[in-house]
Amino acid sequence: MKQLYTVISLLFLFTHTAWAQQHEIFNQRIRTLQVVGGTNWLSLPVSSLGGEPIHIDFDDMTHDYHRYRYKIEHCDANWNVTSSLFESDYMRGFNDNQIIEDAEQSINTNHPYTHYHLAIPNADCQLTMSGNYRLTVYDDNAENEEEGKMFTACWMITEPQPLVKLKLEATSTTDIDIQKDHQQLKMELDHSQLRITHPNQLNIVVLQNGRWDNAVINPKPDYLSAGKMNWQHVRALIFDAGNEYRKFEFLDTDHPTMGIDAIDWDGSDYQVKVMTDSPRPNYVYDEAAKGSFYIRNSDNVENNNTCEYAQIHFTLKAPKLPGDVYLNADWTYGRFLPEYRMEYDEMTKTYHARLFMKQGYYSYQYLMKMEDGSIRLLPSEGNFYQTQNKYNVLVYYRAQSDRTDRLVGYGELK
């Protein structure tokens, strides 16, 4: 028993810096990439072996059909491609030169586009191993593979039946403050079905609102018992409470809907102004999704190929801040790119950004990137213990006979 405790303790001394489950777009023709497990667009793209399919949707901003082929790779817990596996180890069917056949052109839209859809599993390939997966899409007509690389999409597959049991609880009583600015995540993990003899066999990832920029990797438990680990007062699991995400719905090109101040037509584009976001000195409950988005219009029929694209204008009223201010949400794919960075107007004391976006419901927040690369909440956004944050926990395990990490447990606390 003492030897087991030593192994478990050593496990949480290992740190990882490359962890990231982030989609990435390489070609500006690609817009509105969505990866959803089943129909649960409000959560991480997670499904189980034999469970609901993973849906990948995206738009190509042309009206021409492109032969898009895809390749699926299994990744370890650190999101590195598992080179020690054969494709037959994690997949049945074919993985080379598979074409995305489900495509439909937009109908009566100002900006023509072609919508593509892919579901995994499908008739050509079925996944047979739990863990992390990365799909890369290529334009088959490109001169070479690097030029034809369009985007990558990531998702997670759990075991058909969890091999661990997770209990999660969030409290506003923390070692930093009580019912003020922070939340403490408490966890209990029952791993009695697993045989752990080496510190690298178990990896635990904790996310707040699906964000990977502040992910906590392998937090050290403060209680160990036979087959169980407990995190009750772990400093690493104290999170800034933040505030509820902001939101808007752009559903109609003629009439402003929720969160929209004005819609104008300039002869070539719809210019949509989101209501100015002002400082929030007090907490106000709001059921906004935690960065999620959902494509639809007021008719809510054939949303994939009838929704318009428009220039969406964001305005944030705030003093000049010491770091760069970014829009952050699932639809920014966790990336701090120039297109999501806001510019400051000294005359109006406001930040501004303009993005080319498709009709739908969007939730978002503002984050600040400091010169040292650290990410912080904006002081003007508020920090309140009552905030309804979402916490996700991923538990990876590699048995002695395994050549990669499997996802043996997944928990979500809303």
Residues covered by each model-derived region:
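Bacterial Sec-dependent N-terminal signal peptides
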Residues: M1-Q22
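Contiguous beta-strand segments within globular domains
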Residues: Q28-D76, D177-L189, D299-F314
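Short acidic/polar inter-strand loop motif in beta-rich domains
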Residues: A77-W79, C125, D139-M150, R211-W212, ...
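Aromatic-rich carbohydrate-binding modules that target alpha-glucans
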Residues: M91-Y116, W212-P219, L224, Q311-Q359, ...
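Ligand-binding face of N-terminal immunoglobulin V-set domains in extracellular IgSF glycoproteins
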Residues: N110-D140
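Low-complexity, Pro/Ser/Thr- and charge-rich linker/hinge segments at domain boundaries
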Residues: I157-K180, Y385-V408
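Long, internal scaffold/assembly segments composed of regular secondary structure
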Residues: T197-Y283
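Basic K/R-rich, polyanion-interacting modules in nucleoproteins and related proteins
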Residues: V272-L321, D405-K414
